């Protein structure tokens, strides 16, 4: 048997169709409230504006 024939037999049908399998055991990501992201971006903009006022580019 050619090696390509063996490889095709080992590949799941869903993978051959282009579908992705998601496993239940995935690493948890950090969960951040959207309000914290908004506050952090406003603070960052304020810091950048303040620094450009103090030290002109």
Swiss-Prot record:
It is a single-pass membrane protein. Residues 1-33 are cytoplasmic. One of its GO terms (cellular component) is plasma membrane. It is found in: Cell membrane. The chain crosses the membrane at residues 34-55. Residues 56-57 are extracellular. InterPro entries: Preprot_translocase_SecG, SecG/Sec61-beta/Sbh. Its main location: membrane. Keywords: Cell membrane, Membrane, Protein transport, Translocation, Transmembrane, Transmembrane helix, Transport. Component of the protein translocase complex. Heterotrimer consisting of alpha (SecY), beta (SecG) and gamma (SecE) subunits. Can form oligomers of the heterotrimer. Belongs to the SEC61-beta family. Involved in protein export. The function of the beta subunit is unknown, but it may be involved in stabilization of the trimeric complex. This is Preprotein translocase subunit SecG. The gene is secG.
């Amino acid at each position: 048997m050619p090696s390509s024939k063996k490889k095709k037999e080992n590949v799941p049908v869903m993978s051959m169709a282009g579908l992705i399998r998601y496993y239940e055991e995935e690493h948890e990501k950090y969960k951040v409230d959207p309000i914290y992201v908004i506050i952090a971006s406003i603070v960052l903009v304020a810091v950048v504006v303040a620094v450009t006022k103090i030290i002109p580019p």
